[in-house]
Amino acid sequence: SGIKNRLFENHQLIQFLLDSASVFKSKKINFPWLENFLSFTPFKSIIDKNKVKNLFISKDSKSYEINMPFIDLLTAPGGKRNRQLIYGSKVKYFGEADGWAFVQNTYDSYVGYVPQNTIVPETKKTHIVSAPLTHVFLEPNIKSRNIEILPLAAKVSRQMVENGFMETELGWISVAQLKRKTELPKDPVEVSKLLQNTPYLWGGNTSLGIDCSGLIQISMLLCGFAC
């Protein structure tokens, strides 16, 4: 009954439900109270309660990853930005409705919505972007056409190296701006200096815009610490 008097942000409530479901499922406890619980929470305005119930008792989530340079993690479909997810970030995928995927970031456990077409099944990544931003080129040549740009801490897969460039699933990236996942920096403070003078952006996680949480998270993440 004490839960009824608590105020939740949408993402906090979703997280609470997911965490509770995990505990109950592990103990094989039924939870017929779910519909009653949803009837007095703001969560019912975000997702149909039957979909939530299916989510709550569904089979285990699937492992996916972000396939865009970066994408906003939203508190509701078309809603406010809560955080940003970077290319190669691992997420737990719970389901889709009306073109929106409901996911949980495996690094910080934030949950929210991203467009369905911005996630793909998880793949093995070998390297991580170690520069504030890096270009992806069509060919292993700086005069080649750049076809994409990736932010700090984006993860890619090595295919081959030529002329100082690494071929990845996206194209060619300068080797100087990549590090093996097994050879990451050790000092988050030094990493944070790469983002000096970055403009402030609420929920931002890149050198195009970042907030205090994002700065700490990216600095720790590049050193191999989930945060």
Task: Describe the predicted segments one by one.
Residues 64-66, 80:
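Short, contiguous, helix-prone interaction/anchoring segments in small proteins
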Residues 92, 154-157:
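Hydrophobic beta-strand signal
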Residues 148, 158-159:
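A structural feature that tracks compact, well-ordered secondary-structure segments
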Residues 75-87, 140-152:
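SH3/SH3-like (including bacterial SH3b) beta-barrel domains
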Residues 2-61, 83, 87-92, 97-98, ...:
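Boundary regions of SH3-family modules and the immediately adjacent low-complexity/disordered segments
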Residues 185-227:
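Catalytic cores of peptidoglycan-degrading enzymes
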